[in-house]
From Swiss-Prot:
EC numbers on record: 3.4.26.1
GO biological process terms held by the UniProt record: CAAX-box protein processing
Organism whose genome encodes this protein: Bos taurus
UniProt protein name: CAAX prenyl protease 2
Keyword match Ubl conjugation: yes
InterPro entries for this protein: Rce1, Rce1/LyrA-like_dom
Family to which the UniProt record says this protein belongs: Belongs to the peptidase U48 family.
Function: Protease involved in the processing of a variety of prenylated proteins containing the C-terminal CAAX motif, where C is a cysteine modified with an isoprenoid lipid, A is an aliphatic amino acid and X is any C-terminal amino acid. Proteolytically removes the C-terminal three residues of farnesylated and geranylated proteins, leaving the prenylated cysteine as the new C-terminus. Is able to process K-Ras, N-Ras, H-Ras, RAP1B and G-gamma-1.
Catalytic activity entry: Hydrolyzes the peptide bond -P2-(S-farnesyl or geranylgeranyl)C-P1'-P2'-P3'-COOH where P1' and P2' are amino acids with aliphatic sidechains and P3' is any C-terminal residue
Amino acid sequence: MAALGGDGFRLLSVSRPERQPESAALGGPGPGLCCWVSVFSCLSLACSYVGSLYVWKSELPRDHPAVIKRRFTSVLVVSSLSPLCVLLWRELTGIQPGTSLLTLMGFRLEGIFPAALLPLLLTMILFLGPLMQLSMDCPCDLADGLKVVLAPRSWARCLTDMRWLRNQVIAPLTEELVFRACMLPMLAPCTGLGPAVFTCPLFFGVAHFHHIFEQLRFRQSSVGSIFLSAGHLIGPVLCHSFCNYMGFPAVCAALEHPQRRPLLAGYALGVGLFLLLLQPLTDPKLYGSLPLCVLLERAGDSEAPLCS
């Protein structure tokens, strides 16, 4: 999200420094070949993720519990092996990240609490209108609703619901691991931070094109810039899960709602507060040092706005 506000606007126009990249200085492949390796690696990950969903031949619909369980197995295997693609990319390009692989992919403790809470809070602010709409249409009051949400029985029921596990846990975790944590470190040295944010959704789109043949459904936009700003995987996963739960805002229903005036005011207020809080809540200083900045410095790009 930092790509949309403050210094993040400059991400889109990051100029490539003239300093020679470390990979070239060490006799590794040139920038052009490095980019081809990065793109091919990302495309391979996307195809592997999608291909794993169709290893199991079945005539059952995608929401059938048996199909969901099989796909759980497939995507968990691919996601577990995806860091090996980053290791192979590192060997082929000669770029040394300067941090451990897990740290580069967003598995780190420094700044983990703000990285988990602030991006989710910002996303919930953006969805202020839909949250108000959900509250207005709920037959129970706030106190009863909180009791249901906090009840252990409700969570136990969710954990046995295969569709809930897919939409709220497995899909956000595996997709963000593959399409954010693995792809962004490979793309950033080639394209720069800003273009990498908008390149990842292309591979994400390849991975979800198959849904056209199964079911037309809304997919939330990329949260890759959260990963860039915070350097943590947990923020994108939580935001992804929240967006899956909320779905696409029912704007048409809001226009016809009996309380449409306060509801539309909530929509407008949510967007306004989101734009107002975007830059301060995605300031990288809140989340500690960014592993991607170390990677870019090693690759010859230490002048990226987020790293300056």
